[in-house]
Amino acid sequence: RGRFPLCRMAAPNNTSTPKKLVVIYAPPGMPGHLFPAVELGKLLVVQGLEVTVVLGGEDSHGAGGSFLAGIEAASPSLSFHCLPRATLPSDVPAGSFEAQLFGLARASNPDLRDFLRSASPAPEALVIDFFCSSALDVGVELGIPTYFFHTTCIASVAFCLYQQVIHEQTALSFRDLGSDLLHVPGLPPIPADHLPAFILDRDSLSSKFFLGASERLCNSQGLIMNSCRSLEPRATDAIVSGLCTLPGRRTPPLYCIGPLIKPDEAGMQRHECLAWLDGQPKASVVFLSFGSLGRFSAEQIKQMAAGLETSGQRFLWVVRRPTGDEHQPAGDLNALFPEGFLHHTKERGLVVMSWVPQQAVLAHGAVGGFVTHCGWNSVLEAVMAGVPMLAWPLYAEQHTNKVFLVEEMRLAVAIEGYDKEMVEAQEVAAKVRWLIESDGGRELRQRTLAAMRQAKEALDDGGESRTALLNLAREWKNAGDIGNYAIIN
């Protein structure tokens, strides 16, 4: 069995009617997918359901026992089960992380099937991550209504559905299209070269896995979104209206229940950066953070530092070791930056190596802007804090997120050169100064604050996200009476 057989069962229900079980299935080694899944599980428990989070069998990319144990300890209302370690199928190349995720999930299907068959009570619903899409076949085989939970934006799902249409219209790979614009219902035009790298080559295994997953979406009982309609109305309406699927293909119900963001851990010692922020004027600090995998070359770090120094603005910068230098000891910070940088900026800047409590930082009143890699969890945290963004996408779906954020939601402005070898110091300085000092930056801040208010209203009693969640929970609590509760009436 896996390292965590059945880590903890939910507390017994003392009423005469047993609680209905929902199983949420998340892939290994992807905290950005696991955290929202755990938050979804907690909300469902509050609605009277029993929830078990199943974690995909770990491989060399696995998150590790201490990480999983920490998640478990912080989520006492949930049960956890870790599938046995899966063996990578021989037809999956070792060089593609995304293909490995799809392949390992497929290889774990027999173990998932065994767990679902033995679960007591029998699950009323199976909720799966996009990378675990092959598990839909297991749910269908066992007669368990199966839903997808998407940890990306609604616009990404609209594109994913519409990819089947594009696939029918052309035999070219996205890579062949270069910067040609793709026109998808409900979305701004997307440059083909901004799509995730793993789907650019039509005949690659990762691209075939992705297309297969998009087809499975249409065969599910519903699509659960970590977003809300007020943030993405055109994409939401395009999906619900059936504009993103092939003619004759079913569009499953859409449940927009977000934004769900990971709460700050209770009881943790307050990070020193928050005390530093306490001493800064309101909305004066630019926060730069690029996710757990966001690394830059040594020269790019120097360009960023030079730009921040030239800008004259206050900043809090989370810096990771340069690309290729990740495993070296921390050493002297000065070696990473232009000569004198730390001394020259010590009165208005703070550099932190590795980690800060991002949500708490964004929620601090001193923070006036966020330079972000456009990971969706980070975007939602910024929206919920009302902090405007400068978009600097790095990998995966972040380039398309940038398009949606800048062109559609209008909650960010792009750092020019993000798609080139180097972003110059002058661009960093100009954009940071623009964000904090200009009328345009102030207008961007007002739009972000308006989006924050709309998102919070969606989560309140009677709000669209709250209503969608209640409808979803009601479906599962009323066993065998599956209705099509969509958020659009």
Tell where the protein language model's regions lie, with residue ranges.
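Glycosyltransferase specificity loop/lid
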Residues: 2-489
